[in-house]
Amino acid sequence: MAIQEKKTIISGPHILKFDISEIENIYFTSDIHANHANIIKYCNRPFKDVEEMNKVLFDNINKTIGDNPEAILINCGDFIFGNVSMYDDLIDSIKAKKIYNIIGNHDIKNIVQRRTMIPYDETAKVFWSTELIVQIWNGPKLYTIFTVSHYPHCDVHFLGSFNKHGHLHTPKNLDEYTGVDANIARKLKENGMCYDVGVDGNDYKPVKLTDVLTGNLIMYQLSPDHVNFKKWQEIINNKSSR
């Protein structure tokens, strides 16, 4: 499918609901920056050129997902840089059943302004949003909630909500981080409510939801008639109507 030269407004946040039995199928990544030669230098990536980087990063996605026919990949932004004509081929190369893409700052410039986005369709493989709010349900009870965004949203702490984000290119060793976002990354690590799912801090691979659910994330179960659940739902409804 050819890239269409048409500006499109993409809305959000969108609410995704999953049963607890599905959490083994959910993976996160961010800040792939396909075709971005300078990102190799900026982030000290161990690749000789963009061709090698693209191959390794997309091979790693498919190796991590494996042969799971129900795999869901949530990308927290900055999918591609520069040559967006490769966008469709790169998306098609990913084995996931469903791909949720958050709009990153580079996506706005390099994809959104040149492409007509497909409206939400349960049968479509790819869906774009400005932000996601993910609910995990255990039968009739809400098991946990977290937000998914490109920029970290750690001020969104309602009822212990956790945030998965990208943008910062947080490395594994923060002591060696001297980038412009180093101080922010350190504060977020201390905060404990945000997790940077970007490739630079996760061995250039996606992370599985079950691998980042424990430790930092507050677990709870709320029935829909619980007062706190009603408060949370009111917050979401107000946020979605903006």
How would you describe each model-predicted region?
Residues M1-Y87, N191-M193, V197-G201, N237-R242:
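N-terminal active-site segment of His-dependent metallophosphoesterases
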Residues N62, Y87-D92, N183-A185:
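Short amphipathic alpha-helical segments and helix-helix/interface helices
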Residues M117-I235, K239:
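Conserved beta-sheet core of the metallophosphoesterase superfamily
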Residues C76-K95, I108-F127, V156-L159, L174-T178:
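Metal-dependent catalytic neighborhoods of phosphoester/phosphodiester hydrolases
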Residues A34, F81, D107, H153, ...:
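Short, glycine/acidic-enriched loop or turn micro-motifs at the edges of active sites
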Residues I23, N68-E70, A96-K98, Y143, ...:
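A general structural motif
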Residues F28-D31, L73-D78, Y100-N105, V148-S149, ...:
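Active-site neighborhood of phospho(di)ester-bond hydrolases with catalytic His/Asp-centered motifs
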Residues K6-F18, D92-T147:
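Extended active-site neighborhood of metal-dependent phosphoesterases/phosphodiesterases
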